[in-house]
Amino acid sequence: MPIVKVAEVARKNVDYVIIGGGTSGLVAAVRLSEDPSVTVLVLEAGQDNLGDPKIDVPLQLGHTFRNPQYDWAFMTTKQKNANDREILWSRGKGLGGSSAINFYVWIKPPAADIDALEKLGNPGWNWANYEKYSKKAETFHLPTTEQTDLYPHTFDLKARGTSGPVQVAIPAHVHTLDKLFQETMVNKGLKAINDPYSGDINGTWIASSTLDPRTWTRSSSATAYLVPNISRSNLKVLTGALVSRIIFDPATADRERTATAVKFIHGDAIYEVNVDKEVILCAGTINSPQILELSGIGQPEVLSRVGIDVEIDLPGVGENLQEHVSTSTIYELDPGSSHETWDLMRDPEYAAEAKALYAAGKGMQRSGLTSFSYFPLSLVNPEESRVLIDRLEAEVDAQPSQ
């Protein structure tokens, strides 16, 4: 079993140390450990949380937010355009990373966005390759006739994977409001997308979820990749291990700086593990650059301010962070409405009944977020859209030539 005690890895030598047991870290660990001749260690700051109903049961989504057992709960600096508020930025903490706490929506970007990466000078980063490997990760479970009769859900099997580790399905419990929302969007002029996983999401559509319909539990990177390979003797996972620094050998005339060890905090003590081949940093958007900077890799001006010796001058570390914004608009239904919503779960008696139904493979606990519409601002406010485009084009034109 790869989840080990700290004494089993401290001061030991391993071939690969992977920092972070989220999605990228666990996928890398499982792929590397396919070679039985190498040893792989994953250091994860959070806990394993395997079998935890707050993660596994679909309608428990949101219960993990701000909870330090599951969520890093980062807070931004004060945001000028958000009335100087500090905004919560939830990131998964524990095996599976954010795939263990997100809203389990299976979603893919537009093909044009991926192809743009290749056009910027990254050969191979194109939609054709992205589609190939994203399908390889997925097993899409066909919906039942009952689901398709109730849901405005269509799909194209050519865009779906059939033998990957991540289980993908249509949530079993449906809401009449989802169907009405889709019909309303079409009536407003949006096209209904046959399958949003084909590279075109500009319209209105029903999403699939990372749920395993055999158990109606979440399919995270921990359950999809780690659990099926948990018996590999050359794969070890240490949870509760907060990495504080990557240690390097000095550069020589024959080679560049080489990572030789990783220092981490476990409990109240500091430990090291030695690395024979590579350190692979998969600690996420926030923690990865932080670990690099703590290791002396980054902008000298930033490092010197906090007393960190510069190992490698790499000014891009920790810069150019961007994130999309989430805002909510809430509408109350007429008290006499027959539409069923998640508000019913606020009633302890109903919640207890739903829990019992879930144990029998029935009921609202098998719900998910499914209705989506993507459309340009020009569809609803062409005047404001034109103003924004003109402003952005002017800003681009004002930039000095490179």
Spans of features found by a protein language model:
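N-terminal redox-cofactor-binding region of secreted/periplasmic oxidoreductases
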Residues: 1-402
